[in-house]
Design a protein with these regions (language model features):
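Conserved small/polar residues in nucleotide/adenosyl-binding loops
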Residues: 178-180
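Short, charged beta-turn/beta-strand-edge "cap" motif at the junction between a beta-strand
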Residues: 60-63
Length: 180
């Protein structure tokens, strides 16, 4: 059980990190760390930079940190289990946590940090570079210099322009990010 998703880092501070995974070595240690609130010991932070890509498999503890702008693609799912919420309040009240359900679905041991983040900054130009293909979606990155024509052969396509300008189906598109 869980939700498959991925994040493309559009922008982030120079020293940015995301929560991806945890440091528990066994199911028992996972449960102990969570129930005892040993968050600094439990949570695994992964350094990131603009242009990084992260595939987040079901059962992976994950969270976006302050100042990070991401593009998220995910499996259609109504389920989110929150194991920790940094003691934030919504309308003066803590948000609902799902501690026991989270413990049941979190993968032990977590994927290694090295296997979590892909640098997409130096991919070939004018080529569809596949970042991930899974049961729920395919994600490509296209760095375009010049023109490219392609035929849309899939029933659904979502294209996101992250930087620059161009023309898509006769529509002029220009984008400049506000850096955060």
């Amino acid at each position: 059980m869980g939700k498959t998703e991925c994040w493309y880092i559009i922008d982030c501070p120079d020293d940015a990190k995301l929560v991806v995974g945890h440091n528990a070595k066994s199911q028992e240690e996972l449960s102990d760390m969570i129930h005892e609130g040993r968050w600094d010991e439990f949570i695994r932070y992964v350094p990131i930079k603009k242009g990084d890509f992260i595939q987040i498999d079901p059962g992976t503890v994950h969270a976006i940190t302050s100042g990070c702008m991401i593009l998220e693609t995910q499996q259609n799912s109504d389920i989110t289990y929150r194991v920790y919420d940094y003691d934030r309040l919504t309308n003066g009240k803590p948000r609902e946590l799902h501690v026991d359900k989270s413990i049941d679905v979190i993968t032990v041991q977590a994927k290694s940090t090295e296997d979590s983040v892909m640098d997409t900054n130096n991919l070939p130009q004018n080529k569809w570079n596949k970042l991930i293909e899974c049961e729920y979606y395919k994600v490509y990155k296209l760095v375009l210099d010049g023109e490219l024509e392609f035929e849309q052969s899939h029933p659904f396509l979502n294209m996101s322009v992250l930087d620059g300008e161009g023309t898509v189906n006769g529509q002029r598109i220009k984008l400049s990010l506000i850096h955060i």
